[in-house]
Amino acid sequence: MISVTGMGGIGKTTLVKKVYDDPDVKKHFKACAWVTVSQSCKIEELLKDLAKKLFSEIRRPIPEGMESMCSDKLKMIIKDLLQRKRYLVVFDDVWHMYEWEAVKYALPNSNCCSRIMITTRRSDLAFNSTIESSGKVYNLQPLKEDEAWDLFCRNTFQGDSCPSYLIDICKYILRKCEGLPLAIVAISGVLATKDKRRIDEWDMICRSLGAEIQGNGKLDNFKTVLNLSFNDLPYHLKYCFLYLSIFPQDYLIQRMRLIRLWIAEGFVEAKEGKTKEDVAHDYLKELLNRNLIQVAGTTSDGRVKTLRVHDLLREIIILKSKDQNFASIVKEQSAAWPEKIRRLSVHGTLPYRQQHRSVSQLRSFLMFGVGEYVPLGKLFPSGFKLLSVLDYQDAPLKKFPLAVIDLYHLRYLSLRNTKVKTVPGHIIGKLHNLETLDLKNTSVRELPVDILKLQKLRHVLVYQFKFKGYAQFHSKDGLKAPSEIGNLKALQKLCFVEANQDCGMIIRQLGELSQLRRLGILKLREEDGMAFCLSIERLTNLHALSVTSEGESKVIDLTFLCSPPPFLQRLYLSGRLQELPCWIQSLHSLARLFLKWSCLKYDPLVYLQDLPNLAHLELLQAYDGDTLHFRSGKFKKLKVLGLDKFDGLKEVTVGKDAMTRLEKLSIGRCELLKKVPSGIENLTKLKVLEFFDMPDELMKTICPHGPGKDYGKVLHIPDVYSTYWRDGGWDVYALDTFSRDCSPRSGTLIRSHEPRIQWKV
């Protein structure tokens, strides 16, 4: 048992996360889980979170009925799962002793050298939690002067040294941060935007810190530093920054969700030559550059996927939001609302109706983790006709909310991850200002013709992924859209539309959607290939395209495309290709390319190897040949490569200086492949090598015991796994656990590895 304690922002989570993510640490444990403990968490939810992560880590199905289990039952399941396993569990940001008391009985002490770590702001909790196990308490201290200076300069001057004429000013400002890393990073974000030649600007910042920062309270000092960061924001960014207060603590914010919400709220100013989405991305980039928001996850091609706000930053944002009557956060049923409320974010439980509170000015209503559904009319009996944002994501909703019919000003409607099945035409047709309709992971399969009345609609997401184990051909449910979809001229995202309807009319209509950035098509017929290509040629702003044929053996004919969209970055093709479209070679911006069930007769690598920005390539049953050759000096930017179900593949060769940036290689279900790629030892940047259901004959060639003649070729790769789909879950074995007879499946079962990437636009 190890407890790490210290004030908020001192780096407890950062330190423990660095240890937790270290491959040399993780290889010692069979199961690992990181659980973030929110300030208002419930014990049952905490245990469910721990259980789900553990089952996910060892790739086992989650037990049925877990959502309704009591805490005692959950503890028993977790304890049984971890019994006789060496595990590592981290509880981040524990606030109360009873939280630790509740979960510790679920963690068995089987003398397997397991480790439990907690981070907490409370030193008494840190001490008391370690008494029983004679554990250790690590009281994290502020950075030393030289460490703080190094961090400050790295963030302020992007790795360069501080100019001599600014040293005194910078050291004065740095002293006010008192070694608190979060404060240092925040103020560095402000200073990094300043002209290094204007000493007067820097001196003004130095003087504006004010007398309050000289107090003894470290939180007060940090508030002052953050106020400086906030006050330095351009006017258009202040609302965007305050908007982060609506999300719960430790919530992973989806980048595109935030972008669309900002636009719906009216925070994004239009600029000539740019869409509002482009401008919003510029806003986000500036907040990231100022270190006021953190990247939580990225895609394989380097795009920001999720974001988060440090909890201490969030607390101060909430205070500012409250002071300015910007938004109200409700966490308890009895919580009183302000007299006038503009934005309401409900976390965990719906508030009681407050008859005497006016919501006539309510602009936005969002719910997070709410376990019950109450119709809007009952929740707000006095009316809410000015609502522009209604976010019901993950709500226990079964029917389309009828009250929406009166929301003429509504711009953003999300029913994602609900059980809604239909969209009433007489209701949706009234929402003339709607810009985003998010029905992802619902049961909606058709949009009514009334949708064509929504001329401002920019984003339509109506699809559901169905993944279990290996990718299946029909892994997505899309939607039937009105054949005259081309009337929605403002559309930027349309996913996923079934194309085999109305005699291909919808295919011809797609060319009218000149603003499209992302397009997903299902069930494209071979005979519609020419019409589809003519439409795609007109979509010059397209960044991502996903096309799936009617069936695994059905042909996608894209050979008629002469001028592909010049900015295409992501291309996903599922279905038989008689030949690889030659225009793919001209896609200089292409970063991700997935080819599934292509069954090409000729080696596609020859046509793909010179794509200058290709970072992620996935090939599933894409080629019928027996050899794949990655030529020397080619695929210069490739970072992720997946090869799956090549039925005839017998040999893979990697030339010298090929794929010099490759970090992850996955090879699966290639039954005739009996040895690892020749030249794999040249892939010096490779971090992960994973085999999926590959023959034992291949695995024995890299076995550390016995006849493993190729073991030395993969010795430089930190993580080598052999993975098998068994009984509805993934069994994962590390190379160094293979048994003496070199049978990977008789080795030691370890934690799960990163799940296979989904195919999406």
Language-model segment annotations:
Residues 43-49, 59-90, 95, 169-179, ...:
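Mid-core helix/loop region of P-loop NTP-binding domains shared across ATPases and GTPases
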Residues 108-111, 163, 190-240, 245-406, ...:
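Surface-exposed helical/coil interface segments that assemble multiprotein signaling complexes
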Residues 79-82, 87-88, 110-111, 332-342, ...:
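Cross-kingdom leucine-rich repeat
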Residues 12-13, 65, 92, 180, ...:
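Short, conserved phosphate/pyrophosphate- and ester-handling motifs at nucleotide-, phospho-/glycolipid
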Residues 2-10, 14-77, 260-262:
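Post-nucleotide-binding-loop coupling segment downstream of the phosphate-binding loop, primarily
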Residues 50, 54-68, 112-114, 120-239, ...:
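Non-catalytic, charged helical/coil tracts that couple and regulate nucleotide-powered enzyme cores
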Residues 18-28, 71-143:
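A conserved switch/coupling segment of P-loop NTPase cores
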